[in-house]
Amino acid sequence: MADKRYYDDLSGEELDASLVMAARAEEMKEFVKHNVYNKVSVKKCWEKTGKAPIGVRWVDVNKGDKIHPEYRSRLVAKEIKIDKREDLFAATTPLESKKMLFSWAVTEGIGFKRNDRKNGMKLDFIDVRRAYFHAEARRQVFVELCDEDSTRGMCGELVKAMYGTRDAAQNWEVTYTAFMTEIGFHNGKSTPCV
């Protein structure tokens, strides 16, 4: 694999192979840490679904620049959207709702202070690292194993959501909505995902 060439999936520029391999190793550590899948026989996949496991591919990106590289690699499933399925839908906050919240925060004098105890309100942004790995898989999905984790005759049965599966966003939505409700938040009436 040392002679193999890797390219940035966004820019198309050639990437340093050693940095790509390090980024992929980091991603595989996350797969193990979050127990994303259990290895099972490909035979089980065929018995349960009547189909081969879903293929996977690496998405490699340099989020930095040539002087300060910041390589990120994500292993994603290649589940093809053959048909539209409403049961896999995940709500997304409309841009208008976000604009309304920011406008309201500014006009009410809340500002963007991290801890504004005087007004009793707080506006904050949260970015969950590898969010989908925190969501349980809610349907039976089998994926091929990447070269870095392959075992002959085996595939992965998802335990957690995986980027590239059709219901990953919905699984994450169910997980974070349950958490937010549990700590006291309520869904909006006009936009339930706010």
What is the predicted role of each segment?
Residues 1-189, 194:
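Chromodomain-type histone methyl-lysine reader module
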